[in-house]
Amino acid sequence: SFTEYDVLNTSSVVAKIGIHFSELDDQIEQAKQLDPQIIFLAYGMNDVTKTNGDVDKFIKDYSDVIKKIQKAMPDAHIFVNAVFPVQESAVEKEPALANIADYNEKLEAMCEKKQIGYIDNSDIIEDEYYEEDGIHFKANFYPIWAEKMAEVATL
């Protein structure tokens, strides 16, 4: 959505809607061609539902992706965004989304262990930014999120 809402240039974003960890090899190769100094990752929502509450599997899969990225782009600095919380209406439809806090706790610990950046975006989230589905964000959220990532990475 960063490019869709003209927040970031398409030449600096590698993204695919609805993708799972197991499908990231093409995106990693695309990113490698860009030779980035900094990589921001924002994965998880689809894999939270796919792992059905298995936080350890989620962390293992995320860790494997980071290993691939580090191998492909060893000089890049990696920052992992926390999985965004969802509104209660979304949890009612998809109960696996109820324990996102557990995922983020282990995600932060994984980042610490790997000595990579972790971005807790909880301070920028407001109910008004959510779309009706209670999961996705409206266009006005993305500039705020981009600013937060830039701030954390000291860009």
Placement of each model-derived feature along the sequence:
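A non-catalytic structural micro-motif
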Residues: 73-80, 149
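Short amphipathic alpha-helical segments and helix-helix/interface helices
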Residues: 28, 66, 104-108
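Charged helix-capping and loop-helix junction motifs
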Residues: 55-65, 96-103
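Helix C-cap/helix->beta junction micro-motif
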Residues: 72-73, 114
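N-terminal cationic-hydrophobic initiation segments that often serve targeting/anchoring roles
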Residues: 32, 70-71
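Structural recognition of the beta-strand scaffold that forms the well-ordered cores
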Residues: 38-42, 47, 77-82, 117-120
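Catalytic His-Asp segment of secreted/periplasmic serine-dependent ester chemistry enzymes
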Residues: 85-155
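Conserved SGNH/GDSL esterase-like catalytic core that processes O-acyl groups on lipids
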Residues: 1-60
